[in-house]
Amino acid sequence: MSVIKRALISLSDKAGAVEFAQNLHKLGVEILSTGGTAKLLADAGVPVIEVADYTGFPEMLDGRVKTLHPKIHGGILGRRDLDEHVAKMEEHGIGNIDLVCVNLYPFAATIAKPGCTLEDAIENIDIGGPAMVRSAAKNWKHVAIVTDTADFPAIAAELEANNGALSDKTRFNLSRKAFSHTAQYDGMISNYLTSLSDDVLSGQPQIGEFPSRFNQSWIKVQDMRYGENPHQRAAFYRDIDPAAGSLSAYNQLQGKELSYNNIADADAAWEAVKSFDAPACVIVKHANPCGVAVAADTLTAYKLAYATDTTSAFGGIIAFNREVDGETVKQITDNQFMEVLMAPKFTAEALEIAAAKKNVRVLEVPLKAGANRFELKRVGGGLLVQTPDINRINRADLKVVSKRQPTEQEWNDLLFVWNVAKYVKSNAIVFGKGGQTYGIGAGQMSRVDSTRIAARKAQDAGLDLNGACAASDAFFPFRDGVDVIAEQGIKAIIHPAGSMRDQEVFDAADEHGIAMAVTGIRHFRH
């Protein structure tokens, strides 16, 4: 391990820079720097040499040319193990630069600002920074590259422990991270530029939703024992910029390692439960809700959700959108086996009770509003990309197409079952009353079959459908679904409409004295 004697620090994100530079100075490292970083360090009393003084060439072109100089890149790229390189560097007065600390202009923050112009974006495309990062990363055997200020403490500790040197393993890992950093940065620029509208040269072009070249960066969270099935290999990756409140922000408090299917089901449960404003419980099995309820507290919500389908709830994922107490966890553990229990927070008593089931995975996930910008689905040789289905409706958005108007209670129940239907695999039919699902029919090729399944689920659970409401995620292609619903004593239906036979469906509702509201919005889920 060679000792670091000279470092170059040039940062846009300067968090922790002063402390890190102070640690380097204590180890006798000479520090080169530029612009705002140099001023920050000098003001903090850290001895620093301006790059312009080091190279003998001033910054120019409004700061566009600062580090693009042979004394900088030669010092970074030169191989210390090649006599030819060493001789050339000595001939031209180029000294070694052993450590490079660089992060890049804030391009993402710039283009996120309202009114960002093309000129604004272009001026925040870093040139010298990526050049130094790539140079240092390429020459990792001799140069360490730090692009993430969060790494400063660990690097400082290793330098102190090794008398100013870093291991080959550390330098190589930093190199890999650096190349990922520049790849993500260039991908972000490409996404922005290729999503601009045709009036790109107008100064303030419109940004389209889908770039012509689509680049995404992901960070591996874990390798998994296997994938959806034991013969499949798998890993879990986190979006480099995840949406607020997304599952990837989970903190696992206890239990076995999450499996591929655990994560897929937990995501379905979390997206569903956080869509409710009132305290809610969602129980998911094979990515489908099998019981959902809203109530005044988590215990009541769980009891109602569980009552929908006690058989399917076995081995399920249970999610809440409120802090969970000990009484709720005790009720769950007394009732059933579960794979995952998740909520924004758990009381100390709740965790103590859950600890008795040591294999149960307990997750805390921040409850924040937010959705991924895109949903992605791989197909053979391609990728389907769409915006997320985050549409929410209220009573004012609905149109009543039946002779009978819904009652106040029916209005509330219609909105509830409609929200649940959005998270059920198509074809989806949901029956419910009083903030509780009574029957869920999911994933059938025929809508009337999903309707019959929902009715059978309610019957098996001993739940009386008289006066309940029904939701369909898409229109009824024929009146048969409405007829089956009417046979159950259900008195109100919500669905998108849009079928060629809509009038036939509306007439069927009137024949049965059913109140029918249409949304104009479909919620297919595949």
From Swiss-Prot:
InterPro entries reported in the protein's UniProt record: AICAR_Tfase_dup_dom_sf, Cytidine_deaminase-like, MGS-like_dom, MGS-like_dom_sf, PurH-like
Annotated MGS-like domain residues: 1-147
Record GO biological process: 'de novo' IMP biosynthetic process
Pathway: Purine metabolism; IMP biosynthesis via de novo pathway; 5-formamido-1-(5-phospho-D-ribosyl)imidazole-4-carboxamide from 5-amino-1-(5-phospho-D-ribosyl)imidazole-4-carboxamide (10-formyl THF route): step 1/1; Purine metabolism; IMP biosynthesis via de novo pathway; IMP from 5-formamido-1-(5-phospho-D-ribosyl)imidazole-4-carboxamide: step 1/1
Domain of life: Bacteria
EC code: 2.1.2.3, 3.5.4.10
Swiss-Prot/TrEMBL keywords: Hydrolase, Multifunctional enzyme, Purine biosynthesis, Transferase
Residue ranges that the Swiss-Prot or TrEMBL entry lists as coiled coil: none
HAMAP family: PurH (MF_00139)
Protein name in UniProt: Bifunctional purine biosynthesis protein PurH
Originating species: Neisseria gonorrhoeae (strain NCCP11945)
Gene name in the database record: purH
